Amino acid sequence: MAAEGKSLKARAAELLSRREYTRQELVRRLAPFADSEDELNAALDELAASNWQSDDRFARQFASSKGTKFGSRRLAQEMRQRGVDSDTIREALSGQDDLASAREQWRKKFGRLPADAAEKARQYRFLAQRGFPADVIRQVLAGGADDDFYED
C-alpha cells in the first residue's frame, strides 16, 4: 500500500483536511500506525501547538452543525464520547437555543398539537430521543405563548 510510508503528522493532516477531529478520535485513528504511544502523543502535541487540531474548534463546529437537529443533552453526550472536556462542552453549547430547535424539529415532524395521550407520548419520545430537556419538550407540546407558531 502506498500509504504505509506516511508519517503520523501527514496521516493526521489528511484526516483533518476533511473534517475536525478531537484528540481522542485522532489517537484512535492513528494508534495502529504509531511505533509508540510517545511518538503519537508528540505528533498530536505538535498538531495542537500549530493549531491544526483543536478540541475547542471541534466542539464549536459540532454544536453549530448539529445544534438545530438535536438538543443540548444529546450534543453534550456525543461530545463527551468523543473526548471533549466538560468546560469546552459547556462553552460550545452556551449559545444553544433548545426551545427554538425543539420547536423546529417538532414542526417538521408533526406540525400540530397532539390530539390524545398516545400521540402526546409519541411526540414527547421523538423530542426526548433528540436530546431535548423535559421542560423544553413540555413547553413545545403545551403550545407555549407563541400563538402564531401553531398554525392549522
UniProtKB/Swiss-Prot annotation:
Keyword terms: Cytoplasm
Family statement: Belongs to the RecX family.
GO biological process, one term: regulation of DNA repair
Gene Ontology cellular-component annotations: cytoplasm
Keyword Glycoprotein listed: no
Pfam families: RecX_HTH2, RecX_HTH3
PANTHER family documented for this protein: REGULATORY PROTEIN RECX FAMILY PROTEIN
UniProt protein name: Regulatory protein RecX
Naturally occurring in which organism (per UniProt): Chromobacterium violaceum (strain ATCC 12472 / DSM 30191 / JCM 1249 / CCUG 213 / NBRC 12614 / NCIMB 9131 / NCTC 9757 / MK)
DNA repair among keywords: no
Cited function: Modulates RecA activity.
